[in-house]
Amino acid sequence: MDYALLYENRYDLLRKAKVRFFENVPQEYWQFCEKEADWLDDFALFMALKEAHNGAQWSEWERPLKFREAEAIAKAKDTYADEIDFWKMLQYLFFEQWCELKNYANERGIRIIGDVPIYVAGDSVDVWTNPSQFYLDENLEPIDVAGCPPDAFSADGQLWGNPLFRWDVMREDGYSWWTMRLRKMSTLYDVIRIDHFRGFDSYYAIPGKDTTARNGVWRNGPGMELFRAVEEKLGKLDIIVEDLGFLTPCLLYTSPSPRDRSLS
């Protein structure tokens, strides 16, 4: 298969498929849109706007859209309604096929592990729709970003660049963003593997304008308080925690539970 050719032409082909799809829309599509509306509506709008801005990051969009002003959002939903439908259709088809694959595996005794990174990209619908949950300044630019300090393998450390969570804000609403995230992941996968688990105990914060990770500082994370809050709402989840890197005594003491396992 010529994957490069497919990558370059996939959306043109999928847009042709969209015309046929909406000539006879299955009832399951509307049910999917209603069930997944809490994330699907924002995601589809976000992708439609990125397409309209030639792939530019949301932080570079015009101010009314960047700051999600109500009038601008309402106008965008109307202007890009057709493109929004396109992205919703893609998600419906993906989830339909994914569920078929997962069911096929489960029926044969195979469980699927899903890798979930602790951080999300700055140019993501998560940050665009929830800016108060991240360390951003008044212009919605990252104040501090994620990474790892210098070590024997890298004199400059690792500058990942992901915006950091406002754990204080997340604590105030009972970690609802994380609860929603893990709830969705638990439907996609049989087991969730959380990458960079030690970041929940303490995390490395690098000034947002820096070009290396040399000037970062360590800060305390929410610890197991986050997972206790999630468990109260979702019950026990089957989680694998990464044990790669230096694990603090606090992390080693608090992390084990009957359904937790470690996997590097």
What are these regions (language model features)?
Residues 1, 53-85, 128-168, 203-225:
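Aromatic- and acidic-residue-enriched carbohydrate-binding clefts of CAZyme catalytic domains
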Residues 1-87:
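Extended, charge-enriched "interface" segments that sit outside catalytic cores
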Residues 51-53, 66, 117-121, 198-201, ...:
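Short, solvent-exposed loop/turn segments at secondary-structure junctions
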Residues 87, 92-119:
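Conserved, well-ordered alpha-helix/loop/beta-strand core segments that scaffold catalytic motifs
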Residues 101-103, 179-193, 197-248:
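Active-site neighborhood of glycoside hydrolase catalytic domains
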Residues 116-134, 186, 198-200, 219:
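Aromatic-lined carbohydrate-binding surfaces of glycoside hydrolases
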Residues 170-175:
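Conserved active-site carboxylates
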Residues 253-260:
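Conserved small/polar residues in nucleotide/adenosyl-binding loops
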